[in-house]
């Protein structure tokens, strides 16, 4: 990712952008709008296909070369004009050199007709960093997944079934890598049966390459002065489904209703993602209200713990950060959240070395190093060291995010009732005692480590880690703190009249009553972050017994990745794939014995603000047969079946 960069543009006398790297235009100098409508919308017959969609049906468009977003905006405009109200559009686009936000705004200003759609895109076009980035519009009716990086690196990571292709890279003579047999093979792998394709080029080697990949291609009249272009239909075989234990369950058909058990961030996000797709969701919380456990802290930190080595966890964090950061735009800045930035101090030599590797691996608008003087100037208080600054990050009031997600139309909240689930016919039923409170064909467990109270998930290796935060009254002097500062702990600028600092880690205690010892420990973490801030707060003079705070349990897994996705029935799984205990390289051709309609969203540890909301989108994609919003390898690394598979291969149970 160290070579990731925004597009370098020149602007012609008419204010139109040109790529400096490829020496080519982004769209026709005569009429980019009409060109898009002819080459991509008409060739793919999108007007009639959009109009024919049924309630809850989705059409997926794939694109090579997002560029200025013009094709996406034109498709969205047409969809709104002709598609039935209950239909949805998914758009997946790969782009190696995304435009900077200011350049995108300048380019889209050329098309006043598209202003409502352009403004919506620009409003979500933030925290757009390498990898998969998920954006949503029109209350979730329009989904955009940007794959930011080289097409031949990104597309093999994509799990999707594309109904229509826009091939819109720069001209083959200028950008030959975008028109290679390897890319055509990826288009074929990702294509739904009879997927259509349109492209402005009529180059013979492109036509022959697409035919070789399984597309029936023909030359058709081009736009404007271009005599010919290409259109086609995929007629090749369907792609191999891959390992059956990670294969998609059959997309849900029938009544679109779901139960979500758990009113924390994972549950609220899961409910919101389904409700945005037209589902009726019953959100069940055993406490009197939402966000009463780990999601109930007054301030959480939107902090990216990344790796320079592209691990699944690091890629999840990078994609999840962008998604959450865009969600936060719905909330009240300064009260519910603040993009004040996060400064991670280089508190020892090992941490300084790690930070140097990260600064070399990621773009500067995501993170960059500061020396001590720069860090102090930015933070507003004296610090023991410089560190790594994340300018788009900050603090969040998690209950506000939970409330906003749970307010999505289509969600009904049942609070104050602990339930157990029982399968009855084609439904999951939520029972409180002998009373069935709600029923639906699909259920999502989002109760952190307590998902193990439900028999199908009882053997999953989740553990609870107690954490305590301390609330300190702000003083006139402490209000100088302008950014979150982290070392082994963290301290945030004040929300209202209080700072939050923490958080402790206790692997043994099951007691949620705040302790004086952990308040003292949090003050020591603050002393390591900034003795100056400790003094400004007068913390040494505050009686410990008068300090306020709260404790909750984080839920984590052995590999620190969450559990997100469908779950198999364990005994049937062991029987179906017993051969793996003898030879883990085998891939038996046996369908996974899924527990019908049961999904999990749990195990987010201390990263829930970043990973839980995007995990709601991942669940919805699993359920609805949509493009996964994460690389397939990352989705598999988060799959609940990974632990069933691990135990089978190792000859272990439980």
UniProtKB/Swiss-Prot annotation:
Query: Example GO molecular function term?
Result: flavin adenine dinucleotide binding
Q: Where is this region: tRNA (mnm(5)s(2)U34)-methyltransferase?
A: 1-235
Write the record's keywords in alphabetical order, separated by commas. Cytoplasm, FAD, Flavoprotein, Methyltransferase, Multifunctional enzyme, Oxidoreductase, S-adenosyl-L-methionine, Transferase, tRNA processing
Compartments where found: Cytoplasm
Q: This protein's superkingdom?
A: Bacteria
What gene does the UniProt entry assign to this protein? mnmC
Its name, as the record gives it, is tRNA 5-methylaminomethyl-2-thiouridine biosynthesis bifunctional protein MnmC
Q: Which cofactor does it need?
A: FAD
Organism source for this protein? Answer: Pseudomonas aeruginosa (strain UCBPP-PA14)
């Amino acid at each position: 990712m160290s070579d990731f960069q925004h597009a370098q543009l020149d602007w012609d006398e008419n204010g139109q952008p040109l790529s400096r790297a490829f020496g080519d235009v982004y769209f026709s100098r005569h009429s980019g709008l009409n060109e898009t409508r002819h080459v991509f919308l008409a060739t793919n017959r999108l007007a009639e296909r959009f109009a024919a969609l049924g309630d809850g049906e989705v059409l997926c468009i794939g694109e090579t070369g997002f560029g200025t977003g013009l094709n996406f905006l034109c498709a969205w405009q047409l969809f709104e004009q002709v598609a039935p109200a209950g239909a949805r559009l998914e758009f997946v686009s790969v782009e190696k050199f995304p435009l900077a936000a200011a350049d995108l705004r300048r380019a889209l200003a050329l098309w006043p007709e598209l202003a409502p759609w352009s403004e919506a895109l620009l409003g979500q076009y933030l925290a757009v960093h390498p990898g998969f980035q998920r954006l949503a519009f029109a209350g979730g009716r329009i989904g955009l997944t940007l794959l930011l990086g080289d097409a031949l690196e990104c597309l093999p990571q994509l799990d999707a079934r594309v109904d229509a292709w826009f091939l819109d890279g720069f001209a083959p003579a200028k950008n030959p890598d975008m028109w290679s047999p390897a890319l055509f093979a990826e288009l074929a792998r990702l294509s739904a049966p009879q997927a259509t394709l349109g492209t402005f080029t009529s180059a013979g080697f492109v036509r022959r390459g697409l035919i070789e990949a399984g597309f029936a291609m023909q030359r058709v009249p081009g736009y404007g002065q271009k005599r010919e272009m290409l259109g086609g239909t995929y007629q090749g075989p369907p792609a191999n489904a891959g390992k059956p234990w990670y294969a998609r369950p059959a997309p849900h058909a029938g009544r679109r209703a779901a139960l979500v058990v758990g009113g924390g961030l994972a549950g609220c996000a899961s409910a919101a993602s389904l409700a945005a797709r037209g589902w009726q969701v019953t959100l069940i919380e055993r406490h009197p209200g939402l966000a009463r456990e780990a999601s109930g802290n007054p301030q959480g930190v939107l902090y990216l713990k990344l790796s320079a080595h592209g691990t699944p966890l690091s890629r999840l964090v990078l994609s999840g950060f962008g998604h959450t950061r865009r969600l936060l735009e719905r909330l009240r800045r300064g009260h519910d959240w603040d993009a004040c930035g996060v400064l991670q101090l280089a508190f020892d030599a090992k941490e300084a070395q790690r930070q140097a590797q990260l600064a070399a691996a990621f773009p500067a608008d995501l993170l960059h190093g500061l020396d001590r003087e720069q860090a102090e100037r930015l933070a507003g208080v004296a610090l023991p060291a410089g560190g790594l600054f994340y300018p788009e990050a900050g603090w969040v009031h998690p209950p506000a995010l939970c409330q906003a997600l749970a307010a999505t139309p289509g969600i009904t909240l049942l609070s104050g009732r602990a339930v157990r689930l029982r399968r009855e016919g084609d439904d999951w039923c939520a029972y409180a005692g002998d009373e069935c409170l709600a029923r639906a064909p699909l259920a999502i467990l989002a109760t952190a480590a307590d998902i193990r109270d439900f028999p199908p998930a009882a053997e999953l290796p989740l553990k609870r880690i107690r954490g305590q935060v301390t609330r300190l009254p702000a003083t006139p002097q402490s209000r100088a703190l302008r950014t979150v500062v982290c070392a082994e702990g963290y301290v945030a600028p004040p929300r209202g009249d209080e700072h939050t600092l923490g958080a402790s880690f206790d692997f043994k205690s099951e007691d949620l009553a705040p302790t004086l010892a952990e308040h003292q420990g949090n003050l020591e973490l603050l002393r390591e972050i900034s003795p100056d801030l400790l003094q400004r707060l007068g913390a040494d003079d505050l009686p410990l017994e008068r300090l306020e705070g709260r404790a909750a349990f984080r839920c984590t897994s052995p590999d620190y990745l969450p559990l997100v996705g469908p779950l198999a029935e364990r005994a049937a799984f062991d029987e179906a794939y017993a051969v793996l205990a003898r030879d883990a390289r085998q891939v038996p051709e046996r369908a996974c014995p899924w527990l019908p309609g049961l999904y999990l969203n749990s195990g987010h540890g201390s990263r829930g603000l970043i990973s839980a909301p995007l995990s709601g989108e991942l669940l919805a994609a699993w359920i609805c047969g949509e493009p996964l919003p994460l690389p397939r390898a990352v989705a598999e690394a988060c799959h609940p079946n990974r632990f069933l598979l691990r135990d089978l291969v190792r000859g272990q149970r439980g």
